[in-house]
Amino acid sequence: MTDFTKDYKAVAEQFALEGEVTDIRPYGEGHINVTMLVTTDKKRYIMQKINTRVFPDTDALMRNICYVTEFLRKQGVETLNVIATKDGKNYLKGENCYRVYDFIENTITYQTVTDKEVFKNSGKAFGEFQNYLAAFDASLLTETIARFHDTPKRFADFKAALEADVK
């Protein structure tokens, strides 16, 4: 067992996982959180070390995720399943913050898209997600990144970046 595995195994074992942890390895190409694939003798999980510089209010972040996933689940929509810690919390808070989800089999994450069909399908999936949330009470959510969903500001920032990109 590598030092990487030993360090993260102790973290993973703080969660209510099914089975004994048999392997932990880096997973994906994320740019914000450190993501690991945790394998037990019964199933697989995704464990993330949450970037608290990006998400300093981890309580709000996880509360938001739980509100949205619970709302979707009540509608019969397949969604993320947050795995609680052994003491019933939705994430582990210590020197670092960690969360665990069930691993969703047969899924793909793209860092870049060159295929028009994949791009089209991602737009459709996002539209379906928005549609599922149409009746969700957004006032329950806490802003975790200031003005992140401020489309006019984001578009103005985008245009300014384009204008500044002189070749």
Predicted regions and their residues:
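Juxta-kinase regulatory segment immediately upstream of eukaryotic protein kinase catalytic domains
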Residues: 1-25
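Loop-centered beta-sheet repeat module
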Residues: 163-167
